[in-house]
Amino acid sequence: MQFDTLPQLGDSVSKICLGTMTWGQQNSEQDAHEQMDYALAQGVNFWDTAEMYPSPPDKDKQGDTERFMGSWFAKTGKRNDVVLASKISRNDFLRGGNTKFDKKTIRAALDSNLQRLQTDHIDIYQLHWPERQTNFFG
């Protein structure tokens, strides 16, 4: 496995990132755990998730991907072996429909991420979709 260093973190991260957006929709919790075991065994230590996963977004399944990851961290104790990235989302079924990225909303989202992930920190936190006047990319 090839690695790069994240300057602000000083962490060595794999050039391949484990994406998780289907866990809870196309993959079961057991499947997710097996994929995390395999990824780490192959040296993939950079993992990405988001509060809105699984995809496509569904208010009844929202957060399942992070919950699966959190149960794996609790079971294995390997949270510190992973560089974890997650994201705040703007889905209108989250936080009572508040889709603004203000301090209060970001804090509420982050607290929920941490609870589902069963961890006290997320290494990289991102805005899943920027606030913009149009729904088009670009």
Placement of each model-derived feature along the sequence:
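Glycine/proline-rich, positively charged
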Residues: 95-138
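Short beta-strand segments at enzyme active-site cores
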Residues: 46-50, 83-86, 121-127
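N-terminal binding-site loop/beta-alpha segment at the start of enzyme catalytic domains
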Residues: 1-82
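Active-site mouth loops of central-metabolism enzymes
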Residues: 19-30, 92-107
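A short acidic, helix-capping loop that chelates divalent metal ions and anchors anionic groups
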Residues: 53-57, 91-96, 133-134
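Active-site beta-loop-alpha junctions enriched in small/polar residues
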Residues: 21-23, 52, 87-91, 127-130
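Conserved catalytic core of Hanks-type protein kinase domains
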Residues: 39, 87, 116
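Generic beta-strand or strand-like secondary-structure segments
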Residues: 68-72, 83, 87, 105-112
